[in-house]
Amino acid sequence: MSQLTLYHNGPSTCSQKVRLILELKGLEYESKLIDLMSGEQHDSEYIKLNPNHVVPTLVVNENALIESSLINEFLEDAYPEIKARPSNPEKLHQMRLWVKYIDSYHPQCGPLLMVLG
């Protein structure tokens, strides 16, 4: 089984997306909180993992994966036992629209997700 380490921040919308899929799939992972307010995402060791200076980063067997939606796609492909992605083509299209919307507007969606959560 792969060793998963998630570098993330609690209120970060992008981090929430990845944690949601990890929890839905019941995957065990090591949690490493990154303090964005203190600028921890700019530390030289973190930049080696994520040159974009953002969260989340998922390290899988020493390989760093970045970009929350792409991390979730990886998790769906690598751990297919519990499906997060619908198999119905129309529902899959709807899911992809929501992912695109959140990826495009996530700074504005953060407070909305907090209220809905």
Where does each model-flagged region fall?
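GST-like domain detector, emphasizing the conserved glutathione-binding G-site
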Residues: M1-G117
